[in-house]
């Protein structure tokens, strides 16, 4: 059984993989129930984000994370407090919006940087990859994401006083 994630449901690589593994059952999690991937799959789950207008596709990305968290909770049988966790995310977003001047200053530093690096460990690495992509899409600047464990094996040579490094740390006990 395979689970495929695609906001558009038209991703060429995703379609190619689905065709290759057509003998297996699959669930497609998408924002487009009329897509090719949905037609190729056995089951579909709509993230209900509606039409995405922004290039960075943040609304659909966040909706996909929520749907995946709900699915993981259901499949695992764990009684996690997903509702409270989602409320905490909303509160954090409100705090960012309430501190516009602080984040405006940080964003100006980021844009003025020669290059930007996101680092994260474990699941935070995947968030780093997405954050790097979002920054490329909206600011058109050079940015890369690395697993923090890989940092000393090459990428650290690129970091200088004109670099900006953002560490994504959401897991308790994480050592970068």
Predicted regions and their residues:
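Anionic-ligand anchoring segments at beta-strand to alpha-helix junctions in alpha/beta enzyme folds, i.e.
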Residues: 1-2, 10, 24-27, 112-161
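Amphipathic coiled-coil/heptad-repeat helices and related helical stalk/stem segments
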Residues: 14, 102-103, 151-152, 176
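Solvent-exposed alpha-helices and their adjacent loops that cap or buttress functional pockets
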Residues: 20-22, 36-39, 108-111, 157-160
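Short acidic (Asp/Glu) and glycine-rich catalytic loops that position anionic groups and cofactors
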Residues: 46-51, 111-112, 159-163
């Amino acid at each position: 059984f395979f689970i495929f994630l695609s906001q558009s449901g038209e991703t060429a690589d995703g379609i190619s993989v689905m065709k290759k593994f057509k003998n297996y059952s699959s669930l497609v999690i998408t924002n487009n129930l009329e897509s090719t991937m949905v037609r190729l799959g056995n089951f579909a789950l709509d993230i209900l984000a509606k039409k995405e207008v922004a290039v960075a596709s943040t609304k659909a990305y966040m909706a996909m994370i929520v749907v995946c968290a709900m699915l993981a909770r259901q499949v695992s049988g764990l009684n996690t407090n997903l509702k409270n966790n989602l409320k905490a995310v909303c509160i954090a977003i409100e705090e960012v919006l309430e501190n516009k001047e602080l984040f405006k200053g940080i964003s100006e530093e980021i844009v003025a940087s020669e290059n930007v690096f996101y680092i994260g460990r474990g699941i935070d690495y995947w968030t780093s990859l997405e954050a790097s992509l979002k920054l490329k899409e909206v600011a058109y600047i050079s940015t890369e994401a690395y697993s923090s464990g890989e940092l000393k094996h090459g990428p650290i040579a690129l970091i200088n006083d004109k670099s900006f490094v953002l560490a994504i740390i959401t897991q308790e006990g994480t050592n970068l």
